[in-house]
């Protein structure tokens, strides 16, 4: 299990430029991540996804996020996400722990 506070720092440094996590905030360059867990790829209301994201058809959970966050372009070829990924498993675990808390409020 990851460290929520470390995950928050990673989110602020690596994700917050393009994503928000709190309810009722608009999409940025990337979709708002509120309600992420349990949602299928390409399904955030009001955000325009690539066909690749819409067609992937997986549900976001800790295990799918772990694989995606390691190398987004490998997991979903054709995604427009420019983030190269987090290679360290502990950093992914920390970010996922934060996202579980922050996106389900």
Curated annotation (Swiss-Prot):
One cellular-component annotation, GO: mitochondrial intermembrane space
GO molecular function: electron transfer activity; heme binding; metal ion binding
A Pfam family matched in the record: Cytochrom_C
UniProt keywords, alphabetically: Electron transport, Heme, Iron, Metal-binding, Mitochondrion, Respiratory chain, Transport
Blocked amino end (Gly) modified-residue sites: 2
Positions annotated to bind heme c: 15, 18-19, 81
Record SUPFAM superfamilies: Cytochrome c
Protein modification: Binds 1 heme c group covalently per subunit.
InterPro entries with a match to the protein in the record: Cyt_c-like_dom (IPR009056), Cyt_c-like_dom_sf (IPR036909), Cyt_c_1A/1B (IPR002327)
Primary location class: mitochondrion
Compartments, record wording: Mitochondrion intermembrane space
Origin: domain of life: Eukaryota
Family the UniProt entry places it in: Belongs to the cytochrome c family.
Functional note: Electron carrier protein. The oxidized form of the cytochrome c heme group can accept an electron from the heme group of the cytochrome c1 subunit of cytochrome reductase. Cytochrome c then transfers this electron to the cytochrome oxidase complex, the final protein carrier in the mitochondrial electron-transport chain.
Protein name stated in the entry: Cytochrome c
Annotated organism of origin: Macrobrachium malcolmsonii (Monsoon river-prawn)
